């Protein structure tokens, strides 16, 4: 049987990319694989080995994509990574740039330009390619986003563009890291159905890298478990399902009690009204994002913000976090102060702990992880002043709460994407904020870490004067403390 990929006793040439033992693996024609395992277990290193990203000692992987295949491995394999959902790899990007459109270079590509370039790699003839393009655009409902600069898209909109870009080139093998993150329920169902059809028709083969065992779809034929830097043997999906018993581990009692007894950073909260918006409208060009929104968040309330991709959730959070310059033209008060009344952005941010998909993109400096965590105390991206020993002790304590002890000195960019997300969550908590603003905080986390973080959020919010605003597309991710919900509708 045809072997699309074959590796025999593979060992990465560079020590920092090595797994614990040599890897032997074959991907046969007709197989669709799920790669599963805990955060930091080695899944990304295994995929890098499959794609030939890192040279091996001895023989490199062999590839056979069949007659008529393209000459380059990279043309036959498309790999959508977790971090791709945060944008193009642009070193000039900064966290608030999405909300400062006047500073965007016109050379920055639009979504349409990026997708049109992908059409050049399509295996089908021109007419079939255009038909396929129209089908994907309609299925994922992206027409309204095509002429937006790529860095202006929400994380969910950007995720759709990345997926469509890969599908337009019709690769022989498509690898997707956490395919459903950032997508609303409708888009997840559409993608799941489309991938199932493509696998059934033999149009491509699929490797899904999954943090959630319950997201292994029925069109997956085999599963490879990667844990403790070991690649286990490939097994049939039914065999894996019969032996798999995934469950999140509750927060250890010791950690829960330590968190409840943690000294407060401030003796008093700043205001009874944390957020107040009156008739707030936000527009970009001809498109209305928020229209006449009235919203009040009081001290100690815990809000879920829901809505489909592109409904304005991230825009709303940019107003709460003082990142959006349009807030000065709106009737918005934060922590009892009207925007534009003389308070600085940093006067507002010192009360807020924040994490989001966009933040993940902004962290490209390969600093020690504890420095990334410590930057949350100064609200900087990166580390611009040396933390004191007391601040470092506080960072170590919070890393222990989140189970990241031992990662303090590891370079941030050497962590797995799930571990990076945990580190950015620690950064949000490290100054014991009055207000937690969490935009899809459980992205890419395995079952155990999802439960742990959910318990930490719940326990943190049991403390006095703690307010929460949380965005998610998965209702099961919301902690029990949620007592209010705001649902946004996408404006046409």
Model-derived segments and their meaning:
Residues 128-145, 389-407:
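Conserved ABC ATPase "signature" region
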Residues 228-258, 479-480, 488-492:
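Conserved beta-strand-loop-alpha-helix hinge in the C-terminal portion
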Residues 177, 183-184, 188, 439, ...:
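ABC-family nucleotide-binding domains
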Residues 162-163, 425:
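Hydrophobic anchor residue at the start of the ABC signature
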Residues 149, 178-180, 411, 440-441:
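Walker B catalytic motif
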Residues 149-153, 384-387, 411-415, 419:
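Conserved ABC ATPase signature
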Residues 44-121, 317-381:
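ABC ATPase nucleotide-binding domain signature region
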């Amino acid at each position: 049987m045809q072997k699309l990929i074959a590796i025999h006793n593979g060992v990465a040439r560079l020590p920092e990319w090595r797994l614990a033992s040599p890897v032997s693996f074959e991907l046969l024609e007709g197989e669709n694989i799920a790669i599963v395992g805990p955060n930091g277990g080695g899944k990304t290193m295994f995929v890098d080995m499959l794609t030939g990203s890192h040279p091996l000692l001895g023989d490199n992987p062999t590839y056979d994509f069949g007659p008529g295949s393209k000459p380059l491995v990279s043309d036959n394999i498309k790999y959508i990574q977790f971090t791709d959902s945060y944008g193009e790899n642009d070193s000039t990007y900064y966290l608030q740039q999405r909300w400062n459109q006047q500073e965007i270079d016109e050379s920055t590509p639009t979504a349409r330009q990026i997708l049109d370039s992908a059409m050049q790699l399509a295996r089908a003839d021109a007419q079939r390619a255009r038909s396929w393009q129209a089908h994907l655009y309609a299925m994922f409902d992206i027409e309204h986003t095509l002429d937006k600069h790529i860095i202006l898209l929400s994380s969910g909109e950007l995720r759709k563009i990345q997926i469509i870009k890969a599908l337009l080139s019709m690769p022989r093998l498509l690898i997707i890291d956490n395919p459903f993150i950032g997508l609303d329920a409708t888009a997840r169902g559409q993608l799941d159905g489309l991938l199932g059809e493509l696998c059934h028709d033999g149009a491509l083969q699929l490797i899904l890298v999954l943090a959630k065992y319950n997201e292994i779809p029925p069109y997956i034929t085999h599963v490879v478990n990667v844990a403790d830097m070991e690649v286990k043997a490939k097994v049939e999906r039914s065999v894996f399902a019969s032996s798999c018993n995934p469950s999140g581990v509750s927060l250890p009692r010791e950690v829960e009690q330590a968190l409840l007894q943690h000294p407060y950073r401030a003796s008093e909260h700043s205001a009874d009204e944390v957020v107040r918006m009156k008739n707030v409208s936000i527009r970009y060009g001809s498109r209305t994002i928020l229209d006449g929104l009235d919203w009040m968040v009081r001290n100690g309330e815990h809000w879920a913000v829901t809505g489909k991709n592109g409904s304005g959730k991230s825009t709303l959070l940019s107003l709460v976090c003082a990142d959006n310059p349009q807030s000065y033209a709106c009737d918005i008060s934060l922590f009892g102060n009207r925007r534009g009344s003389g308070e600085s952005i940093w006067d507002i941010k010192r009360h807020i702990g924040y994490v989001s998909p966009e933040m993940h993109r902004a962290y490209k400096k390969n600093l020690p992880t504890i420095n990334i965590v410590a930057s949350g105390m100064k609200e900087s991206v990166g580390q611009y002043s040396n933390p004191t020993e007391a601040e470092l002790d506080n960072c170590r304590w919070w890393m222990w709460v989140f189970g990241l002890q031992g990662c303090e000195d590891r370079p941030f960019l050497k962590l797995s994407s799930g571990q990076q997300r945990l580190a950015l969550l620690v950064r949000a908590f490290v100054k014991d904020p009055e207000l937690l603003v969490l935009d899809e905080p459980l992205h890419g986390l395995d079952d155990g870490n999802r439960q742990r973080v959910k318990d930490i959020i719940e326990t943190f919010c049991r403390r006095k004067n703690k307010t929460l605003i949380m965005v998610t597309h998965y209702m099961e991710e919301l902690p029990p403390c949620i007592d209010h919900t705001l649902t946004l509708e996408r404006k046409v």
